[in-house]
């Protein structure tokens, strides 16, 4: 598929099924902890400065945000999880919204699950990965902020993440930096393969 990634726009934000776009376009969902770099990932992948708002305030994305890419596919930005300052009730609401989307959306082709290369995956990261494996949803692990770690230590950090996740070697694992754009081509290859 040829994609003009510059031709991208935020289409709509949705809280539940009735608000989802009603068409056949394939979707790739992006999930990860608050402040893992999801907005930066979207902006880097689409060569845009601030199509997705990067926020210093974690827990800002409270809806599913649908990004139209060249009228051929969509990114769906899922609310960041694991943010402590949000009430338990709010977290449960998000959980239901995310679960409804991930388990019922026919357009969904894969989930890009973002983890921070600098740290071991959190319990939430592990739970998300297990959830996706349980529902047999194709998953691409993207380890962000690779520029913050010396290249010589990438393998060590990658191994630690894979071990903690109980990573399935048939899934894609990509080291990514929105600063250096490392991993951008690999991420696109993995995404397009899933469409």
From Swiss-Prot:
<keyword id="KW-0460">Magnesium</keyword>
<comment type="function">
    <text>Necessary for normal cell division and for the maintenance of normal septation.</text>
</comment>
<feature type="binding site">
    <location>
        <begin position="77"/>
        <end position="80"/>
    </location>
    <ligand>
        <name>GTP</name>
    </ligand>
</feature>
<feature type="binding site">
    <location>
        <position position="39"/>
    </location>
    <ligand>
        <name>Mg(2+)</name>
    </ligand>
</feature>
<dbReference type="GO" id="GO:0046872">
    <property type="term" value="F:metal ion binding"/>
</dbReference>
<dbReference type="InterPro" id="IPR019987">
    <property type="entry name" value="GTP-bd_ribosome_bio_YsxC"/>
</dbReference>
<dbReference type="GO" id="GO:0005525">
    <property type="term" value="F:GTP binding"/>
</dbReference>
<keyword id="KW-0132">Cell division</keyword>
<dbReference type="GO" id="GO:0000917">
    <property type="term" value="P:division septum assembly"/>
</dbReference>
<dbReference type="Pfam" id="PF01926">
    <property type="entry name" value="MMR_HSR1"/>
</dbReference>
<keyword id="KW-0479">Metal-binding</keyword>
<feature type="binding site">
    <location>
        <begin position="144"/>
        <end position="147"/>
    </location>
    <ligand>
        <name>GTP</name>
    </ligand>
</feature>
<feature type="domain" description="EngB-type G">
    <location>
        <begin position="24"/>
        <end position="195"/>
    </location>
</feature>
<protein>
    <recommendedName>
        <fullName>Probable GTP-binding protein EngB</fullName>
    </recommendedName>
</protein>
<dbReference type="InterPro" id="IPR006073">
    <property type="entry name" value="GTP-bd"/>
</dbReference>
<keyword id="KW-0547">Nucleotide-binding</keyword>
<dbReference type="InterPro" id="IPR027417">
    <property type="entry name" value="P-loop_NTPase"/>
</dbReference>
<dbReference type="GO" id="GO:0005829">
    <property type="term" value="C:cytosol"/>
</dbReference>
<feature type="binding site">
    <location>
        <begin position="59"/>
        <end position="63"/>
    </location>
    <ligand>
        <name>GTP</name>
    </ligand>
</feature>
<keyword id="KW-0342">GTP-binding</keyword>
<keyword id="KW-0717">Septation</keyword>
<keyword id="KW-0131">Cell cycle</keyword>
<feature type="binding site">
    <location>
        <position position="61"/>
    </location>
    <ligand>
        <name>Mg(2+)</name>
    </ligand>
</feature>
<dbReference type="InterPro" id="IPR030393">
    <property type="entry name" value="G_ENGB_dom"/>
</dbReference>
<comment type="similarity">
    <text>Belongs to the TRAFAC class TrmE-Era-EngA-EngB-Septin-like GTPase superfamily. EngB GTPase family.</text>
</comment>
<feature type="binding site">
    <location>
        <begin position="32"/>
        <end position="39"/>
    </location>
    <ligand>
        <name>GTP</name>
    </ligand>
</feature>
<feature type="binding site">
    <location>
        <begin position="176"/>
        <end position="178"/>
    </location>
    <ligand>
        <name>GTP</name>
    </ligand>
</feature>
């Amino acid at each position: 598929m040829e994609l003009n990634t510059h031709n991208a726009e935020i289409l709509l934000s949705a809280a539940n099924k009735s608000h989802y776009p009603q068409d056949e376009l394939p979707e790739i969902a992006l999930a990860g902890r608050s402040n893992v770099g999801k907005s930066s990932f979207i902006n880097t992948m689409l060569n845009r400065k601030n199509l997705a708002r990067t926020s210093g305030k974690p827990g800002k994305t409270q809806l599913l945000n649908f990004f139209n890419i060249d009228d051929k596919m969509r990114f769906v930005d899922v609310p960041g999880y694991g943010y402590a300052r949000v009430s338990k009730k709010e977290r449960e609401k998000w959980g239901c919204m995310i679960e409804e989307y991930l388990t019922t959306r026919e357009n969904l082709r894969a989930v890009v699950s973002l983890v921070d290369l600098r740290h071991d995956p959190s319990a939430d990261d592990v739970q998300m990965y297990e959830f996706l494996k349980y529902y047999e949803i194709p998953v691409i692990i993207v380890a962000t902020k690779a520029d913050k770690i010396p290249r010589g230590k990438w393998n060590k950090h990658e191994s630690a993440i894979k071990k903690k996740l109980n990573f399935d070697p048939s899934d894609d694992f990509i080291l990514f930096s929105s600063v250096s754009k490392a991993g951008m081509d690999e991420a696109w290859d993995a995404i397009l393969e899933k469409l």
